[in-house]
Every structure is written in structure tokens, then in C-alpha cells.
Regions:
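A short acidic, helix-capping loop that chelates divalent metal ions and anchors anionic groups
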Residues: 53-59, 94-100, 291
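Glycine/proline-rich, positively charged
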Residues: 93-193, 200
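Short, well-ordered coil/turn segments that N-cap beta-strands
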Residues: 11-16, 43-45, 81-85, 122-126, ...
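N-terminal small/glycine-rich loop or linker at the start of catalytic domains
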Residues: 7-26, 88-101, 124, 129
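Terminal-tail/helix-coil boundary detector
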Residues: 207, 231-256, 260-261, 275-279, ...
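Conserved, mostly hydrophobic/aromatic
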Residues: 6, 18, 32, 47, ...
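N-terminal binding-site loop/beta-alpha segment at the start of enzyme catalytic domains
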Residues: 1-84, 151
């Protein structure tokens, strides 16, 4: 496994980040522990979760359970593992029935951090990420709460998730004025089929020195070789079948290119991300040990300039005309 700095920090993380959104939901605790064991053995030292993970992932989710954090916490208790990993979690989502049980008020940040530490059975979080932007809370309040956690040793670094480019700029401007390090990483939806962040978020990350952690690198499985795989699980749903038909011409060209390269579609999709200098580590979310093992090979794949150009032709970037394409 190769390692790189997380953004402009001195912290070294693996080129793949293990996402645990499925832990406690579609993946039971025993399998989750096996995935964590296999990841650590393979050299993955970057593990990402969130307080809300472990609940059934659906658009109408009402309240998080913290189950994913609890599973990781019980795994960490088995000795010697905490010192070998970089542990990241998130704050923002609804975690209780009260009016202050969500978002990024100082009240909720303090309580959410304490709850995450308890569930994770650790005394500190390495990277504490804001899961979404909160337009109801001033940045001065957010940073004051985060600075206190850092001063107390409960958090080492702060990251963001699903931020727009101008949100990153605003956050960093306020942090700089307070003589605070500010954001060190951003998690964004980014893959060959979803390249909108190339307009503003990636330039913002490059400018401010944030590491980029792309989530959904395989577009929910769409880039995993769906045309030649038997439909199962999420791929068997009618909505996913319609998505395949919508992208069938591109998928046929893409999977044909991967076959010519002698690489799997999922490995090519991950390798494409890894060759972007702003990308720190794609966020992989294996549901099984076998899926994790398949993803590891991607770190050894190098795509030629011609292949990168072919991928751009199949899956074009956002493009556009000013000011939309040059808003940063």
C-alpha cells in the first residue's frame, strides 16, 4: 500500500480510505470486523465513518443510530489497533429528537463529539468532518467549537463533506482570521460519471491545500462492470436498471476499453481518481471481504495519457462556458 499526505498536513494516510457506511446496515458486525482486519492487514490505515451510519440508508432517514461507530469501537478494543489507524468521523446529521440534536451549533458539536468518542471507545478523533454545510450557524461559532475540541486533544484535524467551493473558501477565510489551521480535507461525490466538482470544489481544494476524498467512486456500482454481472442487491432494483439503460452507450464503450486494458472496470474507475494529484484517497465501501480484496489492486494500476483521453471522451467533464465553468 502506498501512502500520501492528507492535504497540506504532515499526516500520512493510505491511498484508499475504508468507508463504513454499510456497517450495521447491509453488513453485519462479524463481516464488518473481518473487513476491518483485512484492510489493516493490506496496509489501509485510513478509516472513515459518521455518527449517522449504521441506520438503514434511505432518503427519509429520521435519526442516526451510531451503530457503525459502535462496531468500529468494539473492533478497536481488541488491542493495538488504535495506534495504527487514522480515524475519521462526521457531525451534522440528526442524532436525537431534540431541536439541538443536529447541524453545527456549538451545543451539538460538543455533544456529538463526546457521543462519537464514547461509541468509538477512543480518546480522540483524528479527522472530524462536517457532514454538510450549515447555513444557520455562523462560522465564528463553528470554529470556536472546533478549536476547543482541538485544544482539548479530542480532535486533531477538521474536514468537510459535501461543501461547495465557496463554502470551503468562506470557512478558510474565517479560520485564517482566527489563526486556526481550518479545513484539511473535503469529501465530495466524484467519479467518472459525476465530475461537477471539477468546476469549483477541486480548484478550491488545490488552492487551500485540502486533500480530496471522493465518495461513491464507482457511482453506486455503475462503474463496476454492470453489463456483464448478474443483477443482485442494489443492481437488481428497477431504478438501477433504468440507470444502466440511460448510460448503456457509455457503459459499453467503457467496459470495452477496460477489457482492452486487461483491467476490471472498478479498478480503472479507482485508478482514474488516484491519478488526480488533488485526490488523497478514494472512499471505498465494500460490503464483503471479497469486494475489499478486489479494490486493493487499483492502487497498482497506472493509466496512460491515451487511456485518460479515452475516458474523457466516454465520460466528459462538466465543461460549459463562463461564468459557469470558471466561477472559481
Amino acid at each position: 500500500m502506498n501512502y500520501t499526505h492528507l492535504g497540506r498536513t504532515g499526516l500520512k494516510v493510505s491511498r484508499l480510505c475504508l468507508g463504513t457506511m454499510n456497517f450495521g446496515d447491509v453488513t453485519d458486525e462479524k463481516t464488518s470486523a473481518s473487513i476491518l482486519d483485512e484492510a489493516l492487514e493490506a496496509g489501509i490505515n485510513f478509516i472513515d465513518t459518521a455518527d449517522v451510519y449504521g441506520t438503514e440508508q434511505s432518503p427519509d432517514i429520521q435519526q442516526g443510530s451510531g451503530l457503525s461507530e459502535e462496531i468500529i469501537g468494539r473492533w478497536l478494543q481488541q488491542g493495538g489497533r488504535r495506534e495504527r489507524i487514522v480515524l475519521a468521523t462526521k457531525v451534522y446529521q440528526t442524532m436525537g429528537p431534540g431541536p439541538n440534536d443536529r447541524r453545527l451549533s456549538a451545543y451539538h458539536i460538543r455533544k456529538a463529539c463526546e457521543d462519537s468518542l464514547r461509541r468509538l471507545k477512543t480518546d480522540h478523533i483524528d479527522v472530524y468532518q462536517m457532514h454538510h454545510i450549515d447555513r444557520h450557524t455562523p462560522w465564528e461559532e463553528i470554529w470556536q467549537a472546533m478549536e476547543l475540541l482541538v485544544q482539548q486533544g479530542k480532535v486533531l484535524y477538521i474536514g468537510s463533506s459535501n461543501f461547495a467551493g465557496w463554502d470551503i473558501a468562506t470557512a478558510q477565510s474565517v479560520a485564517t482570521a482566527r489563526h486556526f489551521l481550518g479545513l484539511v480535507a473535503e469529501q465530495s461525490l466524484y467519479n467518472l460519471t459525476a465530475r461537477t466538482i471539477e468546476l469549483e470544489v477541486i480548484p478550491a481544494c488545490r488552492h487551500f491545500g485540502l486533500g480530496l476524498i471522493p465518495w461513491s467512486p464507482l457511482a453506486g456500482g455503475l462503474l463496476g462492470g454492470v453489463l456483464k454481472k448478474m443483477a443482485s442487491g442494489r443492481r437488481a432494483r428497477p431504478a438501477f436498471a433504468r440507470l444502466i439503460e440511460q448510460y448503456r452507450p457509455q457503459l459499453e464503450a467503457y467496459e470495452g476499453l477496460c477489457e482492452d486494458l486487461g483491467e476490471t472496470p472498478s479498478d480503472v474507475a479507482l485508478a482514474w481518481l488516484l491519478q488526480n494529484p488533488v485526490v488523497t484517497a478514494p472512499l471505498i465501501g465494500p460490503r464483503t471481504v471479497e469486494q475489499l480484496q478486489q479494490a486493493l489492486h487499483a492502487t497498482t494500476v497506472t493509466l496512460s495519457d491515451d487511456t485518460m483521453s479515452c475516458l474523457d471522451e466516454i465520460w466528459p467533464g462538466p465543461g460549459g462556458e463562463a461564468p459557469q465553468a470558471y466561477a472559481w
